UniProtKB/Swiss-Prot annotation:
It is an enzyme of class 2 (transferase). It catalyses: 2-C-methyl-D-erythritol 4-phosphate + CTP + H(+) = 4-CDP-2-C-methyl-D-erythritol + diphosphate. This is 2-C-methyl-D-erythritol 4-phosphate cytidylyltransferase. The gene is ispD. Belongs to the IspD/TarI cytidylyltransferase family. IspD subfamily. The keyword Nucleotidyltransferase applies. One of its GO terms (molecular function) is 2-C-methyl-D-erythritol 4-phosphate cytidylyltransferase activity. The keyword Nucleotidyltransferase applies. One of its GO terms (biological process) is isopentenyl diphosphate biosynthetic process, methylerythritol 4-phosphate pathway. Catalyzes the formation of 4-diphosphocytidyl-2-C-methyl-D-erythritol from CTP and 2-C-methyl-D-erythritol 4-phosphate (MEP). It comes from the Bacteria. The record marks 161, 217 as: Positions MEP for the nucleophilic attack. It comes from Pseudomonas fluorescens (strain SBW25). Its EC number is 2.7.7.60. Disulfide bonds: none annotated.
Length: 235
């Protein structure tokens, strides 16, 4: 592990609508502790002294972003969101190039709806991967018993959970390598669910860095309620 923390750029893909939340607005704009989820997700990066700049990918017709105080932050640039996450991230990487980022610069991609990232986890990721030839991501070992099922919901087998980890964010890779992996996988119409899967598709083996299990992504209403209760108990 490196004792230094490398400088980095951050990308936040925030063009999704979060349909499973069944809310009146995209989930990243729901309130949590007096601010939007997106503002919390951005905050851990904006507070970090090693940040070189940040790009947030937004839907072209996003009516909520301009009302946020952070929209005027000069460290934040806006990129056009794509129809899928990979397109949003790719557009953000192109924006980073325009800002002067080089192919060997580190880029951290973080979910817009993952507001509980701790500074300790961010520092751990940066330190552990500072000299890594590939990069990697925060992740958490599977704790529950896992079942593989058929299309009818019948159990086929119990999976060895010692080999299974849940992928979290941030995910940290060199700009040039990530750009090539995403662009090539899109041309090949490969199934890409996160940046690590694009790197895997390109033949790389990202490293997993164990993080906190409470760095959850808000996907369903109960996730947001859990965070609200947890944050209320901190007071």
């Amino acid at each position: 592990m490196s004792e230094r923390l490398p400088a980095f750029w951050a990308v936040i893909p925030a063009a999704g609508v979060g349909a499973r939340m069944a809310a009146d607005r995209p989930k990243q704009y729901l309130q949590l502790g007096g601010r939007t989820i997106l503002e919390h997700s951005l905050g851990c990066f904006l507070d970090h002294p090693s940040l070189k700049g940040l790009v947030v990918s937004l839907a072209a017709d996003d009516p909520y972003w301009p009302s946020l105080a952070c929209a005027a932050d000069p460290r934040i640039q806006r990129a056009e969101g794509g129809s899928e996450r990979s397109g949003s991230v790719l557009n953000a990487l192109l924006q980073l190039n325009a800002l002067g980022a080089g192919d060997d610069d580190w880029v951290l991609v973080h979910d817009a709806a993952r507001p509980n990232l701790s500074r300790d986890d961010l520092d751990k990721l940066l330190a552990e991967l500072a000299d890594d030839p590939v990069g990697g991501l925060l992740a958490v070992p599977a704790r529950d018993t896992l079942k593989r099922v058929d299309k009818y919901g019948r159990v086929i087998e119990t999976v060895d959970r010692s080999l299974i980890w849940q992928a979290y964010t941030p995910q940290m890779f060199r700009l040039g390598a990530l750009h090539r992996a995403l662009a090539d996988s899109l041309v090949a119409d490969a199934v890409i669910t996160d940046e690590a899967s694009a790197m895997e598709w390109s033949g790389q083996a990202p490293r997993l860095i164990e993080g906190r299990s409470d760095n959850i992504k808000v996907t369903r209403p109960e996730d947001l309620e859990w965070l609200r209760l947890r944050w209320a108990n901190r007071r």
